[in-house]
Amino acid sequence: MGNIYHTALERYSRKLEQSEYDWFVVPDAVRRQMAENAMQEAIAGYPGMAVCDTAENAYQRKRMLAIFDQTVWALTRQVRAGQFVPEKFEVTFDELEGKESLEYRLSHDVTMRLEGRIDRLDTFEDENKISIKVIDYKSGNTKFDLIRVYRGLQLQLVVYMDAAMEMLRGQHPKKEILPGGILYYHIDDPVLESDTPLSDEEAEQALLFALRPDGLVNSGEEIYRAMDQNFEGKSQMIPVEIKKNGEISTARSKVASTEEFAVITRYVEHEIRQCGEAIYAGNIAVNPYRSDIETSCTYCPYASVCGMDAKMPVLDALTSAP
């Protein structure tokens, strides 16, 4: 299902790009029609979903159309809340050929090149600077966790940001390129819970908050305000909360300074290099991790043939970083 949503989002973005509208001004009726067309085309590309020959297939198709319409609505509201402009969609690493951030020189004169795809890249530009926001669409409820980054389990978004920044430095050599944020958007249909009946407006606000992306945002006020210009207290668009004195609540926000983004990036580069060296050395040890809620075996497609018992003590505990 995740692939269908990804394809539909790419098609919707292209349709909007080729129209007379953009994310900031597209009328609701046009947005809904474009979204429906994009999803219908995406479904048609998957034979198992293309023909509604059963009631189950017909229901699933109808539900996917509804979730996708809601997804495009929420993404549009998130864009309109700020000044970041969606610029690029489904950018493959092949399009970033020659970027040093994607190539690692290993021992024995071996070069390792990374493969991947950036779902969406937004920019906020002024006379001297360009800030970048990287969005990764997820059909599962992925949360950004610095502990997982430290353990080498969640390196993807940091790599995407590094590659995007290098690309823009080459395109705009006279401007400062800054990390704005790395965010996961969960494609979902959340159930709203409330002790009292909600008005239509309250339900809409609650839905936006439930669909708020998760990730890491630059703590610079000019940057996070460019993602959500008018919020007070908790933002409905980014994982940031402001205290009454106007300062960021670090306990309730996921933020990092530009300098801290750079430190995280250097650490991720080190981890990737270490992984590359281990792969080249032939290290294929069965050494999965374990956290409080899952192990690396939980969603592994090879679990049926691996033979690893999740109860074995070999599983490394995923604990707080020192």
Language-model-derived ranges and their functions:
Residues 1-322:
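Structural signature of nuclease core domains in nucleic-acid processing machines
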